[in-house]
Design a protein with these regions (language model features):
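Divalent metal-dependent catalytic cores for phosphoryl transfer on phosphate-bearing substrates
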Residues: 150-152, 161, 172-291
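Acidic/His-rich, divalent-metal-binding segments that scaffold phosphate/diphosphate chemistry
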Residues: 92-214
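Structural detector for short beta-strands of small beta-barrel domains
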Residues: 11-27
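N-terminal intrinsically disordered, cationic/polar leader segments
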Residues: 271, 288, 295-318
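Short, acidic/hydrophobic/Gly-rich beta-strand patch recurrent on exposed beta strands
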Residues: 35-40
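OB-fold nucleic-acid-binding modules
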Residues: 1-13
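Divalent metal-coordination and catalytic microenvironments
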Residues: 17, 62, 166, 247, ...
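OB-fold single-stranded nucleic acid-binding module
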Residues: 22-32, 45-48, 52-97
């Protein structure tokens, strides 16, 4: 298979890809064309069909399609211009080639996250974590889910990978700043994005659900936690409120989707850890995506509002 991350300007392509997005648009001259995003497990590529008259069969979003075309460059990014297209036939594709997945071991990451669960000393917080991570159905969804539609960790296992990274950062914060309530912070880190299992649909769609659009993962996760707490006898009300506050405030600012700003030091630490891992992974993914471009500098990145490049390695000549 010719994977998307292997495509370069000037390449001719005849391959099956997943049509993740399909929109009808018009040129300035009023001519109708299709603007699409095609996907495989290595990434996505902006795709256009300029001529809809010949060789273009009917297809829908989320169909697997065989395309013939050539790769060009538009504003510094690869673009696939399609000449011919038809829906892929049974046996022409394997779904595992089209679902992006973490490069790390899913089982290995979950085992490491479980060790943090097992080291929580507070009996109420431990019961809460066991209520989630002792549920086989929840665990299966949690391990397979992404952490985002596109920006960071938007791949199978991404939610687990992001959660583990945030938890490890919070564990470091607890060593560096002993004032932190470790059990509260670690529990908050492990649970901070659990709402995403219902905010985003399963692969291959990996798109926002109706409830995800209307409510969002922060509130959804808080509601999930509240439901579990109600089934734990004697769970202290103050501790419950502190935990829920950490979840509600973990995006840090109202404009970033948090209904509350951090009022506890643990909520502040969780916000920093979440933001750090999200931005680091976003930069890593941006460098990987831009690696297809020639030249040391990779161009302007909208998310970081800066021209970016990879760091030079020791021993390289200037």
């Amino acid at each position: 298979m010719r994977y998307i991350n292997e495509l370069r300007e000037g390449d001719n392509v005849s391959e099956v890809y997943l049509c993740k997005v399909k929109n009808i648009a018009k040129t300035k001259a009023g001519k109708t064309y299709y603007s699409m995003i095609l996907q495989d497990k290595t990434g996505v590529i902006d795709t256009k069909i300029w001529d809809l008259n010949n060789g273009i069969e009917n297809f829908e979003q989320m169909d697997y399609i065989r395309v013939e075309g050539n790769v060009t460059s538009f504003q510094g990014s690869p673009q696939l211009n399609v000449r011919r297209l038809r829906k892929a036939r049974e046996g022409e594709f394997a779904m595992e080639d089209y679902i992006p997945c973490s490069s790390k071991s899913i089982d290995g990451m979950f085992k490491e996250l479980s060790s943090y669960v097992n080291h929580v000393q507070n009996i109420y917080l431990r019961q809460l974590l066991v209520a989630f991570f002792g549920d086989k159905e929840f665990v299966a969804k949690f391990k397979a889910h992404s952490a985002a539609k596109r920006v960071h960790h938007g791949f199978m296992g991404g939610l687990l990978e992001h959660t583990l990274s945030v938890t490890k950062l919070c564990d470091f914060y607890c060593t560096q700043y002993p004032v932190l309530n470790k059990d509260l912070l670690i529990t908050s880190a492990i649970c901070h994005d659990i709402g995403k299992i219902d905010e985003l649909s399963d692969f291959p769609e990996n798109d926002y659900t109706d409830v995800g659009q209307l409510v969002g993962h922060i509130v959804m996760g808080t509601m999930m936690i509240d439901e579990k707490i109600r089934n734990i006898n004697g769970f202290p009300a103050k501790l419950a409120n502190e935990l829920k506050h950490c979840i509600l405030a973990h995006h840090g600012e109202l404009e970033y989707g948090s209904p509350k700003k951090p009022a506890l030091i643990e909520a502040l630490a969780l916000n920093f850890a979440d933001n750090t891992d999200a931005k680091m992974e976003t930069f890593i993914e941006a460098l990987a995506e831009e690696s297809r471009q020639s030249g040391e500098w990779k161009g302007y990145n909208k998310l970081f509002e800066s021209n970016i490049r990879a760091t030079s390695h020791l021993g390289e000549k200037d």
